[in-house]
Amino acid sequence: MCGIVGFIGEQDAKEILLKGLEKLEYRGYDSAGIAVQAENGVVVYKEKGRIAKLREIVDENVAASVGIGHTRWATHGVPSKVNAHPHQSTSKRFTLVHNGVIENYELVKKEYLQDVTFVSETDTEVIVQLMEQQVSTGLSVEEAFRNTLSLLHGSYAIGLLDAENPNMIYVAKNKSPLLVGVGDNFNVVASDAMAMLQVTDQFIELMDKEIVIVTKESITIKNLQGETIERAPFTAELDASDIEKGTYPHFMLKEIDEQPLVIRNIIQKYQDENGEIELNQDIRNAILDSDRIYIIACGTSYHAGLVGKQFIEKFAKMPVEVHVASEFSYNMPLLTERPFFIYISQSGETADSRAVLVQTNEMGHKALTITNVPGSTLSREADYTLPLYAGPEIAVASTKAYTAQLAVLSILAADIAKAKGEVLDFDLTHELGLVANAMIELCDQKEEMDALAKQFLATTRNCFFIGRSVDFYVGLEGALKLKEISYIQAEGFAGGELKHGTIALIENGTPVIALATQEHVNLGIRGNVKEVVARGANPCIISMKGLEMEGDSFVLPTVHEALAPLVAVIPLQLISYYAALHRECDVDKPRNLAKSVTVE
């Protein structure tokens, strides 16, 4: 959700900034802009829409080796050129980009900036105007920056240019991700490392309420008290090819195809030298010392948590609750005496989940983060981390991170079960290997998936997914994928709930996708299909081999029933992908959505 880049050195800043913003497109945005320190002052370029439009207006003849850039996802003010970043103070001395939400911006305007004429509707403009007001009182730029930040309540990642000090960038963060990259006679700023892999793989993590002064030769980190902090850089373990589509038309299709490799990678990472599942002893002990597990997540990660609940309760016989993070923060349930929290987040930056983690940390409860970004905020602030090892996921709609979450949750459940003396009736590592094989088989059946999408979804306005037991949870994820990228109104329901209201929406031709992978509820879901067919529905039944019946639309290769969700979701991902193509939707960057949701 939004992205920041900055560059200071001797090279052409404009092109580096534009390329950096292109690498941040996956985070979601509705407008973009850059500002560069040119010979005659700061020059700002910004546009509503795609970065390609921004490129068209950037003057190639303007020489600049210092600049900042931004992709905006609207929170305050409509998507527009005026509301796009960078924003400038009235005198144009200060130019600023900002990710996050300033919660008290209206109070700041009223108390400090009554005489200022604002150009935009954004909370961000308040910061840059406040900066100018603070300098006007006689403070140095650094003192004014520190004072400005002390008056703000909320989240921010900030890059600031000062026209009177053109050889530096001022940077600060609080509750919003930001890195500083280290180069040879240059330095960079970025919301995440992928943006600046083009020039460096050395980055320094910034902590909340730190101020950084960046020049081409130095990086000076200070706290709000002005004390200097030393911190060594880390090497970003990313390959530039990981964030390229290669021969694929879309990142989403590439990431769907990468899932078998991801599962095998997870097996390898979580095996000991004897090929046995082995997790950190401290994680195991903390969970065993608890009396209930609480899984906190949003969106796709929440759906993974629902399946994870099944894994843990069935394998390890421990009670689990799953909560939507945004609801948990404001309506915390009664907790048991010894709760253990699991936070699931692809990015590790999800603001709603972090808000809960802050609360539970203050209460003294242990927490584990399951994330694709081990150095992320959630990872740093939780007690333990289990990485997904899925590699960068660029498409906004999550695919490989979801199945990676399921695989890691199954491994966690099996490890706890083993520690408790619970015996599984199958070898998890072997069965996960079979899951990877089944995924390969499914990914090779794209023509069949395309045909199903064309038959059931190409022209429909709505669609329902039904399932029982764990298939219900997979159906929720299938519905989310479809609505995210094809803009079809799609909903997932428990099969048994149809007659309690939803069946009123069924009419002639309504597509209903039914999942049948669980033997103990197979007859039940078949009965639900008959109910909707009797009302005119157009059923698409996806069943597991051995449970199939005449008329099923697609039969999945056999895997262990407990791990069926990892396989059953693949056709749903592919059907959603092809439905979006048939409807000429932007698959990788669907409207109004952001990959990393860093504001509450």
UniProtKB/Swiss-Prot annotation:
Gene Ontology biological process terms in this record: carbohydrate metabolic process; fructose 6-phosphate metabolic process; protein N-linked glycosylation; UDP-N-acetylglucosamine metabolic process
SUPFAM superfamilies: N-terminal nucleophile aminohydrolases (Ntn hydrolases), SIS domain
Group of enzyme by EC: transferase
A single GO cellular-component term on record: cytosol
PANTHER family, alphabetized: GLUCOSAMINE--FRUCTOSE-6-PHOSPHATE AMINOTRANSFERASE, ISOMERIZING, GLUTAMINE--FRUCTOSE-6-PHOSPHATE TRANSAMINASE (ISOMERIZING)
Keyword line: Aminotransferase, Cytoplasm, Glutamine amidotransferase, Repeat, Transferase
Function of the protein: Catalyzes the first step in hexosamine metabolism, converting fructose-6P into glucosamine-6P using glutamine as a nitrogen source.
HAMAP family xrefs: GlmS
Pfam family, one: SIS
Coiled-coil positions: none
Name the UniProt record assigns to this protein: Glutamine--fructose-6-phosphate aminotransferase [isomerizing]
